[in-house]
Each structure stands twice: as C-alpha cells, then as structure tokens.
Amino acid sequence: KMQTMVKFGYHQTGGAGVTNNDTNLKNHNSFFADFKIGDEYLNLKDEKLSLKIDVEGHELNVLEGINKTLVNNKCILQIEIFEKNFQSVNNYLLSMNYKKIFEVKNRSNFFYKNL
C-alpha cells in the first residue's frame, strides 16, 4: 500500500512511502501497488549500468532485490540513504566491493561504484 500526503489540496510527489495494508494516516492519499524483485526482471550481465535509487527508507530492501544485477555488472549508483539506514546500506555495498566515491553534503545522496 502506498501513501502520499495531501497539502493544499495536492498530492505530494516526494515522500511517498510503503505502509502495511491496515495503516490509516490522516491527510494521506492511499493506493495499492504491486512490488517486484528487480533481479526477477533484470537479466543483465557484463553491462555498464547507472542506477538512481530513491526509495524513502527502503534502500537495503531494493539493493537486496537487485543483488545479482549489482554483482554481475559494472555499476555506478546514486542512492539517497536515510541517515538511520546509512551504516547498514554502506556496509552492504562495501561487502559487495562497492566504493563510495562522492557525497552530496546535507542531502543524503551518495555515489558508489564497482568499476
């Protein structure tokens, strides 16, 4: 279930999040969405990829879902990482031989590569 906040009569495009089906938040618009595991659809090997990941706190789930893609290809990642998730996401990427190459200060955006 996806939820977005309504401000001034408009649905906000940033800050949407995934919640449990029974979560009911005031002032939010809700809709259901199907989520897929990336590696079940991405059949890529020995490619050069650039991926942007901005998933509002679900960074590790997404990375785990594209693990084969990340291992089998040369990638540059731009990933927004919530502060509370940074250590686990950073450790996960380092364990897969990714190196942090740049950070946008005060924006929680990090760039990694395995090239």
Segments (PLM) and residue ranges:
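Phosphate/nucleotide-binding beta-alpha loop and adjacent structural elements of enzyme active sites
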Residues: 1-115
